[in-house]
């Protein structure tokens, strides 16, 4: 066994092959220890791999191409024409000051033939505190993957929130324009306009969504199983989404019908 190098390095291991462990003085210069790979730094170490490089966005939809070429510069132009947003990069390009917050991360289990499979469900709210809010839900095997997926889903679900006044139209809009109601499963949330300076009178979950939507003063009423955070957040999101569903008297004025961005820029879309 001694002639073959023994068990330590008899089969070409890190010790130097069948000839046994190579003496320290016979090692070639510059290769270091640990099998001749220069130790921990031989492959660049932790810093040698670098972070993830951001690749340039290549849009795959017509709307994405128009946004990248600055043909569309606001989210309102997209909402007024009811254009579906299929790429989250569109939101990043038009609304760069979005803030996201993780509402909850809960483990969920599924019974399989091999046993219980555990995954993680993430609820993420996103908004710019200026009339745009979104809510995303994602389930994944890892927490980080679930959060990233929920952020993408929230960006694709960003909706405009209409703000109004409680009494006289003095200053900037600060509350919801009228009473609105949202429902999800057994949870029902009602948003009620409030005077300036009242603040958001609400439970913690709707308060975060209302704050991200840019609403400063609001009364809320909720009923149902509000302990279910997911349904509570979805009901609040549905209520905020309905702020543009009511045609109040200040919107009765008729306006000329404009062409959609696809019609205005059809020549550019045909060339590219």
From Swiss-Prot:
InterPro entries per record: Ribosomal_Su5_D2-typ_SF (IPR020568), Ribosomal_uS5 (IPR000851), Ribosomal_uS5_C (IPR005324), Ribosomal_uS5_euk/arc (IPR005711), Ribosomal_uS5_N (IPR013810), Ribosomal_uS5_N_CS (IPR018192), Ribsml_uS5_D2-typ_fold_subgr (IPR014721)
One GO BP: translation
Keywords per UniProt: Repeat, Ribonucleoprotein, Ribosomal protein
Q: Name one GO cellular component term.
A: cytosolic small ribosomal subunit
- Name the residue ranges with Gly residues bias: 7-22, 30-48
Q: The S5 DRBM domain covers which part of the protein?
A: 98-161
Q: Tell me the segments the record calls region Disordered.
A: 1-57
Domain of life according to the entry: Eukaryota
**Single Gene Ontology MF annotation:** RNA binding
Q: What happens when the gene is disrupted?
A: RNAi-mediated knockdown results in a significant reduction of the mRNA levels of ztf-7 and blocking cold-warm shock-induced exosome translocation from the nucleolus to nucleoplasm.
Q: How does it assemble?
A: Interacts with ztf-7.
The family note in this entry says: Belongs to the universal ribosomal protein uS5 family.
Its function, per the record, reads: Component of the ribosome, a large ribonucleoprotein complex responsible for the synthesis of proteins in the cell. The small ribosomal subunit (SSU) binds messenger RNAs (mRNAs) and translates the encoded message by selecting cognate aminoacyl-transfer RNA (tRNA) molecules. The large subunit (LSU) contains the ribosomal catalytic site termed the peptidyl transferase center (PTC), which catalyzes the formation of peptide bonds, thereby polymerizing the amino acids delivered by tRNAs into a polypeptide chain.
State what protein this is by name.
Answer: Small ribosomal subunit protein uS5
Organism, scientific name: Caenorhabditis elegans
Q: What is the lineage of its organism?
A: Eukaryota, Metazoa, Ecdysozoa, Nematoda, Chromadorea
């Amino acid at each position: 066994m001694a002639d073959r190098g023994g068990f330590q390095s008899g089969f070409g291991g890190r010790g130097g092959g069948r000839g046994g462990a190579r003496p320290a003085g016979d090692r070639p210069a510059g290769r270091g220890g640990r099998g001749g790979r220069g130790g921990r730094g031989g492959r660049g170490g932790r810093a040698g791999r670098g972070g993830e490089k951001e690749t340039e966005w290549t849009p795959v939809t017509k709307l994405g191409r128009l946004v990248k070429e600055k043909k569309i510069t606001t989210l309102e132009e997209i909402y007024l024409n009811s254009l579906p947003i299929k790429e989250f990069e569109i939101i990043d390009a038009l609304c760069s000051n979005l803030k996201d917050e993780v509402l909850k991360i809960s483990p969920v289990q599924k019974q399989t033939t091999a046993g219980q499979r555990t995954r993680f469900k993430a609820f993420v709210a996103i908004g710019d505190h200026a009339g745009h809010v979104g809510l995303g839900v994602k389930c994944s095997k890892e927490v980080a993957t679930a959060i990233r997926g929920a952020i993408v889903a929230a960006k694709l679900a960003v909706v405009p929130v209409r703000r109004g006044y409680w009494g006289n139209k003095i200053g900037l809009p600060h509350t919801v324009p009228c009473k609105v109601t949202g429902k999800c499963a057994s949870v029902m949330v009602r948003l009620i306009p409030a005077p300036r300076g009242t603040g958001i009178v609400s439970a913690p979950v709707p308060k975060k969504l209302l704050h991200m939507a840019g609403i400063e003063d609001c009364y809320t009423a909720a009923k149902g199983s509000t302990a279910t955070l997911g349904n509570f957040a979805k009901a609040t999101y549905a209520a905020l989404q309905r702020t543009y569903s009511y045609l109040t008297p200040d919107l009765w004025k008729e306006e000329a019908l404009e062409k959609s961005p696809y019609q205005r820029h059809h020549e550019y879309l045909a060339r590219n």
